């Protein structure tokens, strides 16, 4: 599995381009990600195995993935909710809570990734939940810890793409439930008879504002503080037993 940290050179978790130049930070080119994917997919031809690309972030990577899937190679692909909801401009002036791995890319990359979900090139949307203490995120950008929490905001951010008509609801559900379960070969992700009764009850339209202090996570390093969202989980059942309720 190719994970985000393999795509990130130390102290370079910002996209290489206009924003990195303006902020005076060392950037990481999307070509680095593309090269790793090309390498691994070449190895897949020689050594067939189950292979999952955990998080891609660029149009360049999608081009490689499309070519290989059209050639019949079997593998799965994931993308972080951050990379389909935000772009490098959201970093503004050194917003370290948006230092992520893989880094936020161009708006064109974000749109391409959303399209990749829609056409089936990307199979899974992940939270990239990376807890860090706030002090480690409040350092100068190059020294700040990488990552953001994401479990509680994964679904609402994904629903934003539904509300703005970027993605159909069934595709979002598929990428959050059915596909991950199929990849992991576990009996979850559907409501069919015999499946584990892991169920979320959702209000698709409930408005709320992200406040780190109100999140359940012990770590509070959210990348979307004060963001207005629409849609929230009201109840969660695990194997039929209620484990969460607002």
Question: Which residues does each PLM region occupy?
Answer:
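C-terminal cap of metal-dependent C-N hydrolases
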Residues: 140-143, 196-246
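His/Asp/Glu-enriched, well-ordered alpha-helical/loop segment
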Residues: 20-48, 116-125, 130-204
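A short acidic, glycine-rich active-site loop
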Residues: 21-32, 98-108, 145-149, 222-228
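Short, flexible, mixed-charge acidic loops at enzyme active sites
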Residues: 10-18, 89-94
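Short, solvent-exposed amphipathic alpha-helical segments in soluble enzyme
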Residues: 13-14, 66-71, 217
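Active-site neighborhoods of metal-dependent hydrolases
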Residues: 50, 54-156, 160
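Divalent metal-dependent hydrolysis catalytic cores, especially in the metallo-beta-lactamase
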Residues: 5-6, 40-56
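Single conserved hydrophobic/aromatic residue that forms the stacking wall/gate
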Residues: 1-4, 8-9
């Amino acid at each position: 599995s190719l994970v985000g940290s393999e795509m990130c050179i130390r102290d370079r978790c910002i996209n290489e381009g206009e924003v990195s130049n303006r902020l005076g930070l060392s950037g990481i080119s999307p070509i680095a990600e593309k090269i790793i994917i090309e390498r691994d997919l070449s190895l897949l031809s020689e050594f067939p195995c189950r292979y999952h690309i955990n998080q891609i972030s660029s149009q360049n990577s999608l081009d490689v993935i499309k070519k290989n899937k059209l050639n019949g190679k079997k593998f799965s692909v994931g993308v972080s909710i951050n990379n389909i909801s935000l772009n490098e401009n959201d970093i503004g002036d050194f917003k370290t809570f948006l230092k992520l791995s893989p880094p936020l890319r161009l708006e064109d990359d974000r749109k391409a990734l959303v399209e990749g979900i829609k056409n089936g090139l990307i199979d899974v949307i992940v939270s990239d939940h990376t807890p860090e203490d706030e002090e480690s995120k409040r350092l100068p950008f190059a020294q700040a810890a990488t990552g953001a929490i994401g479990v509680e905001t994964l679904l609402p951010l994904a629903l934003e793409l539904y509300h703005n008509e970027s993605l159909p609801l069934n595709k979002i559900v598929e990428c959050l439930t059915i596909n991950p379960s199929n990849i992991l070969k576990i009996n979850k992700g559907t409501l069919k008879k015999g499946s584990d009764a892991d169920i979320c009850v959702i209000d698709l339209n409930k408005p709320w504002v992200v406040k780190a202090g109100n999140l359940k996570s012990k770590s509070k390093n959210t990348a979307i503080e004060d963001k207005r969202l629409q849609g929230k989980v009201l109840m969660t059942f695990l194997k039929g037993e209620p484990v969460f309720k607002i």
